[in-house]
Amino acid sequence: MQQSIHGGDIYSRQIQLDFSVNGNPLGMPAEARLSLLAAIDHVGEYPDAAAGELTETVSHMLSVQNGREIPKEYLLFGNGASELFLAIVHALNPKNIVIPVPSFYGYEYAAKAADSHIKYAYLSEETAFCPGKELLQALTADIDLLFLANPNNPTGQLLGREYLLELLEHCRQQGIIVVLDECFI
C-alpha cells in the first residue's frame, strides 16, 4: 500500500484535527454555505477555464487592499497548490531547485516530475527550523528556483519580515525565482 504524500487523508485513519491541510476545523462558515446553496443550480455547468470573473474580482480586491493596481495577468488559479507547483516547474523547466527541509512534500514531487536537480537546505532543530544563513548559503548562482513556505509546512514557522526581504533580495541578485507558498498565511 502506497503511503499518502498529501495531507487531508481522512479515509485511511481517524484524524481529530488535521493541520496538514488548510481546512477549517470549525466547518464551513454560514456565509459560504449560503453562497454554495445559492449556486446549486449551476453545479452541472463546466467552470470558466480562464477563471475570468474570479480573476477580475481578486485583481480588484487586491488592488483596493494594496492601494495600487494588481493586474489580473499576475494571478493564476488552480485546483490546489500542488497543481500550481507542477505547472510552474513544467513552464520554467528549472535545472536546479532548492528546497528547505523540513518542507511540504509537494515541492519535491514537482521538482522530480520536472527532472530538476534538488539541493536540500537542511534547517536546524537548534533554530526551531527557522531558515537562516544555511538557506542563504544554499542559494548560489547555479540555482534556478527556490520553493519556500511561509509559514512553513509542517513546522508552522513564520519568517520575519527583515529576513524575508533579505532572502528575496539575495535571490534577485542571484537570478533565482522564488515560489513563495503562503497557503497557510
Model-flagged regions — what are they?
Residues 19, 178-179:
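Residue-level marker for buried hydrophobic side chains located in beta-strands
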Residues 26, 30, 52, 177:
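Electropositive phosphate-/nucleotide-binding environments in soluble metabolic enzymes
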Residues 44-172, 179, 184-185:
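Conserved core of the PLP fold type I
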Residues 1-46, 57:
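N-terminal "arm"/small-domain region of PLP-dependent enzymes with the aminotransferase-like
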Residues 4, 39, 97-100, 177:
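Short linear sequence motifs
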